[in-house]
Amino acid sequence: MLKRSAYTLTGLALLSSPVLATEEDSGSFWREEAMKTEFVKPEKVIASQKKRVVIDRITTVVRKELGEEWVASALKIAKVESGYQCHVTGPKTRHGRAKGVFQLIDSSARTLGFDPGKMYDCNENIAAGVAHMKVCIKYGVKDPRGMAACHVAGWNRWNVKLAKQHERYKQRYINMASA
């Protein structure tokens, strides 16, 4: 019932337009509009707004620190790692649990000069993730595939062939993050 009334109110406003009234058959117009309209739960709208804020923040910091050419790589890595969510914890590994948007482990955060306890703070994690990217560039990364490899394997091992299982994982990650 609510859907119909929303369509009706919107329809009345749109049909009052002389262009729409003369150019469109109202029945076909509304059938097409109904097919395009997607009703989204409020929680999803809030989640997408939060993601938009994170995406904008990553874009701003990467542009400032690394340049426009690295924005797409940073966004792909953040999407693969956390879906742009700030309070995400990765699975337990022999290196520890990765945290935040860029899924940094405590030792990486510490090495980069960041407090591991602040990795759930979105701004702090983004700054640490961008600092990691900066080190990767210093170690010779020149393209998105190299950046994905460096993010997953570390700046000392990004361009070497790893043990079979780790190499397979690295290659799958590179394909996801550079697609």
List where the protein language model places each region.
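Sec-dependent signal peptide recognition
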Residues: 3-11
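Hydrophobic core
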Residues: 13-14, 18
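Boundary at the C-terminal end of the N-terminal hydrophobic targeting segment
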Residues: 19-23
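Substrate-binding strand-loop-helix patch
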Residues: 26
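Catalytic glycan-binding domains that act on GlcNAc-containing polysaccharides
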Residues: 29, 35-179
